[in-house]
């Protein structure tokens, strides 16, 4: 099974190769086999990307917003036309079940392109009357923006970052995760087919040193990262030295609160979506599931029943509901957290091991795992695991669970399940998290902002807010009379 692209990088509207770069093997997580071989960007590749972006950006920014938007919307159409092909590529790249990639990856990328392509013509400055004279503001492009992606949603992240940047008139250079470098190249081809001028969307591959080179480049106006908190801190420090704009979408250890009046099956479904989708590799996952003591036993019993029915196996079988983790290293990390959970006294309700799957013995699979009797101080309740491991904690009253939910360095997301919408709104109003749900979980519509509080990030993806983060404001004062000067 192979997925070798035409070349490692996409610069100035064309595939580009430089075999002097460090080899970058692409591994299919379900089997452990190498499906492609790429090369990390050399300094020459990086400079070529900036030269192409610089050449194209000014003319692009001068276009009418509606003209820029038209190209983005055409790109969305192309992604939808090729959704099945792109979904298969994403499954090869990530190991995620095709059942999932068909609806959640290229499809979400298309949604973002369609949204920003449509709304950009209405994203304007403001007019301020000043008693005869007046002022107005202009929203202007930043210049060349850099995106650094994660390996859980490669094409979605590439589009979520590039769509608002391009809509605002910026040029974009994207570095995918070294684990999942393929689908960003497919997005670049879609942009090209849609008529995006050469040089506006460039893809450079590489490891952390390439990301650092992009962050520190003198022509970089903004950096948008999806990644871990430690990586975010390093990039913030580097960008801060040159006062570059940043958006940081980082990790989480989000609370999901289930009150005793909640619809039990819906709450369990939400908890499973918030822990097992993408094999648990979702930054906003609600991995701390707080369940009211009155329904705790019923909740866990039914949760375990449903979790044991999750179908694990061949990601290309559309009946498969869960694929492997991204790598052997990630699987070993998750298994180490499961070991810690048991050692610290949590009850392993189900899962916790490596399934035996015929034909996939070298894949990076792990069973969906549920821990009960978890306390707030346990490692599995404090640290982001990034795998299919759910911690169920018991609570007895509203004020208590709000305080415990907020007792975290993270603040990316939160959810509440209750039949009392008044209580739902009240609780969410007290939770320190940037993206919240009531009677749902992990639904991320591109029309609304996505991002976190505290250590979970700075800035927002999606919604009109994202356009603000890819632009700068110019204020213009217009004097309608004579200048009144004491000199």
From Swiss-Prot:
List, in alphabetical order, the Gene Ontology terms for molecular function in this entry: betaine-aldehyde dehydrogenase (NAD+) activity; metal ion binding
Per the UniProt entry, what are the Gene Ontology biological process annotations, in alphabetical order?
A: glycine betaine biosynthetic process from choline
Cofactor or coenzyme needed: K(+)
Name the active site residues: 161 (charge relay system), 249 (proton acceptor), 283 (nucleophile), 461 (charge relay system)
Q: In which pathway does it act?
A: Amine and polyamine biosynthesis; betaine biosynthesis via choline pathway; betaine from betaine aldehyde: step 1/1
Q: What does this protein do?
A: Involved in the biosynthesis of the osmoprotectant glycine betaine. Catalyzes the irreversible oxidation of betaine aldehyde to the corresponding acid.
Record protein name field? Betaine aldehyde dehydrogenase
State the species of origin: Brucella melitensis biotype 2 (strain ATCC 23457)
Q: Its gene?
A: betB
């Amino acid at each position: 099974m192979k997925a070798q692209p035409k070349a490692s990088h996409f610069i100035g509207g064309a595939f580009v190769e430089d075999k002097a770069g460090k080899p970058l093997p692409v591994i299919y997580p379900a089997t452990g086999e190498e499906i492609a071989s790429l090369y990390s960007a050399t300094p020459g590749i990086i400079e070529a990307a900036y030269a192409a972006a610089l050449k194209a950006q000014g003319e692009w920014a001068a276009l009418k917003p509606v003209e820029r938007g038209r190209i983005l919307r055409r790109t969305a159409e192309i992604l939808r036309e090729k959704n099945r092909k792109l979904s298969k590529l994403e499954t090869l790249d990530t190991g995620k079940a095709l059942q999932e990639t068909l609806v959640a990856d290229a499809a979400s990328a298309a949604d973002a392109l369609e949204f920003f392509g449509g709304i950009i013509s209405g994203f304007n400055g403001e007019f301020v009357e000043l008693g005869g004279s007046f002022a107005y503001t202009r929203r202007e492009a930043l210049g060349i923006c850099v995106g650094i992606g994660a390996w859980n949603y490669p094409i979605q992240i590439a589009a979520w970052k590039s769509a608002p940047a391009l809509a605002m008139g910026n040029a974009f250079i994207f570095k995918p995760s070294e684990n999942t470098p393929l689908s960003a190249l497919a997005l670049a081809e879609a942009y090209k087919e849609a008529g995006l001028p050469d040089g506006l969307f460039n893809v450079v591959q590489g490891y952390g040193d390439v990301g650092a080179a992009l962050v520190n480049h003198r022509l970089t106006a903004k950096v948008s990262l999806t990644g871990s908190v430690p990586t975010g801190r390093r990039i913030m420090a580097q960008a801060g030295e040159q006062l570059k704009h940043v958006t940081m979408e980082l990790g989480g250890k989000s609370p999901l609160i289930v009150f005793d009046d909640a619809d039990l099956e819906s709450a369990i479904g939400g908890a499973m979506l918030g822990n097992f989708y993408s094999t648990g590799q979702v930054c906003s996952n609600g991995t701390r599931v707080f369940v009211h003591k009155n329904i705790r036993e019923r909740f866990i019993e039914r949760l375990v029943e449903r979790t044991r029915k999750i179908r694990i196996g061949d990601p290309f079988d559309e009946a498969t509901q869960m694929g492997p983790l991204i790598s052997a290293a990630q699987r070993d990390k998750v298994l180490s957290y499961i070991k810690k959970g048991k050692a610290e006294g949590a009850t392993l309700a189900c899962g916790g091991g490596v399934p035996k799957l015929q034909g996939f013995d070298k894949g990076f699979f792990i069973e969906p795992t549920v821990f009960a009797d978890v306390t707030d101080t346990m490692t599995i309740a404090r640290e982001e695991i990034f795998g299919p491991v759910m911690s169920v904690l018991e609570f007895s009253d509203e004020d208590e669970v709000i305080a415990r939910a907020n007792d975290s360095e993270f603040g990316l997301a939160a959810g509440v399940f209750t039949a009392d919408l008044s209580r739902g709104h009240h609780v969410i109003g007290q939770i320190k998290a940037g993206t919240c749900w009531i009677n749902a979980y992990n639904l991320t519509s591109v029309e609304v902002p996505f991002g976190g509080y505290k250590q979970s990030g700075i800035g927002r993806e999606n919604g009109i807010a994202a356009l603000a983060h890819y632009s700068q404001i110019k204020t213009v004062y217009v004097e309608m009379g004579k200048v009144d000067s004491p000199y």
